[in-house]
């Protein structure tokens, strides 16, 4: 995951960062460390003009299952040339990935405390078709922030 921060970063006595700005790559159901930066930094930029990189959190998340870690990957359409800006990456409708991802999440977390409380908020991401990966990822981040009661300043 590509991340960078600007100068003028302050630390609290317990070591937490009180910073000014962070630059993050887009992420599909981002890891906790990614979400933590939304809370720590005063301003967060999510890069939409960087070139898409395969095998990154841009279209992949990792969940914990009874059998270990499982990666869930959003399929993307092929693009012309060697590079394509993240903002132009289209989600492929090939296969039943939405159904498979939702079933994997339900299987892994369905018996967890509070899953029923959050399931109705998360299910729509697997029922609706999305055109662009960046937009899909940002809608997920917005919903996660709402559920976690985090109000980041994201651009």
Q: What are these model-derived regions, one by one?
A:
Residues 2-155:
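Residues lining hydrophobic/aromatic ligand-binding pockets adjacent to catalytic sites
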């Amino acid at each position: 995951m590509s991340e960078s921060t600007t100068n003028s970063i302050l630390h609290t006595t317990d070591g937490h960062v009180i910073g000014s700005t962070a630059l993050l790559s887009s992420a599909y159901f981002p890891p906790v460390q990614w979400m933590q930066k939304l809370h720590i930094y005063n301003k967060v930029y999510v890069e939409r003009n960087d070139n898409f990189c395969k095998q990154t959190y841009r279209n992949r998340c990792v969940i914990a299952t009874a059998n270990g870690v499982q990666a869930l990957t959003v399929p993307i359409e092929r693009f012309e040339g060697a590079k394509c800006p993240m903002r132009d990456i289209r989600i492929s409708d090939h296969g039943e990935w939405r159904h498979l991802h939702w079933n994997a999440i339900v299987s892994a977390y369905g018996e967890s405390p509070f899953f029923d409380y959050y399931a109705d908020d998360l299910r729509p991401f697997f029922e609706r078709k999305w055109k662009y990966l960046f937009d899909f990822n940002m809608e997920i981040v917005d919903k996660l922030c709402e559920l976690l009661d985090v109000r980041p300043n994201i651009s």
